[in-house]
Amino acid sequence: MNAHANPRPAVRSDWTREEIAALFDLPFNDLLWQAQAAHRAAHAANEVQLSTLLSIKTGGCPEDCGYCNQSVHAETGLKATKLMDVRAVLQSAAQARDAGSTRFCMGAAWRNPKDRDMPAIVEMVKGVRQMGMETCMTLGMLTGDQARTLADAGLDYYNHNIDTAPERYDQVITTRTFEDRIETLEHVREAGINVCCGGIVGMGETRADRVGFIHALATLPVHPESVPVNALVPVKGTVLGDMLADTPLAKIDEIEFVRTVAVARITMPASMVRLSAGRESMSDAAQALCFMAGANSIFTGDKLLTTDNAGDDRDAALFARLGVTPMAAECKVELAAE
């Protein structure tokens, strides 16, 4: 059977919390069997997309996200930087492309971008696309006009995570609301940009909270094209890093993490499910189970914004052991006009 015979299978946006909870409660083998079947119906079974994430503006963010060491409220000693020069960003993109990445993601530690920064952002998007790579930005909240500007520049994806379950949101962040996140996602959709939206598990939440997190994503009118699933990297000096340090909750159980990936795959079968932060501390066996559960995208390189990542050599060795191959880029090279 052609793995791409049904690239966009029928999807549902009417999942109930009870249905999602029942998936989480399945025997592990049954859950993985369902997830793998859903995965193969829409995606190549043994291909994984390689993406690279670059911090183009680090630290100094006014938001109080309890998980983030780039917040001005965190006491981590991280020094804030200005927005990177366009040329330096494009040099990093070229290095990522040469290392095998097909998507280049650029992240800025802002509550929202200022209009004065948009011309440089536009040049970054255009420059990366001319290399034949897919582009993704995560810049915080957007206005409708800013989303349209990014769309006109050719931006492929905009990342804006919902972070956690709606009912738990104010326990993690107080400087914005869950509804603020949804509003930006609506602007991105209306502008015609693909949505990258997921969140973080391992923040001391319960399984019921993880059910709520998946439910919020799987009941969006249109599912995100990419769903990053992050495992919290506890950083000393952040609210959650200090709260969870030296407790059993400091790291999510790997089997529970795999379950979360599997449920994301079943409920959002056409989406790319990306293993994101926290992968550097996962065993190879746990990562292999995540791929079995339907994950088909990872971030490569030694860094994810300001935290450590698994690294290219370890990833290449794991792919070789698993018989997994990198996915080709969908973005065509755009030649500049003469």
Curated annotation (Swiss-Prot):
One Gene Ontology MF term: 2 iron, 2 sulfur cluster binding
Pathway(s) served: Cofactor biosynthesis; biotin biosynthesis; biotin from 7,8-diaminononanoate: step 2/2
Cofactor: [4Fe-4S] cluster; [2Fe-2S] cluster
Listed GO biological process terms: biotin biosynthetic process
Cofactor note: Binds 1 [4Fe-4S] cluster. The cluster is coordinated with 3 cysteines and an exchangeable S-adenosyl-L-methionine. Binds 1 [2Fe-2S] cluster. The cluster is coordinated with 3 cysteines and 1 arginine.
SMART domains membership: BATS (SM00876), Elp3 (SM00729)
Matches recorded under InterPro entries: Aldolase_TIM (IPR013785), BATS_dom (IPR010722), Biotin_synth/BioAB (IPR002684), Biotin_synthase (IPR024177), Elp3/MiaA/NifB-like_rSAM (IPR006638), rSAM (IPR007197)
Subunit structure: Homodimer.
Protein name: Biotin synthase
Chain's gene name: bioB
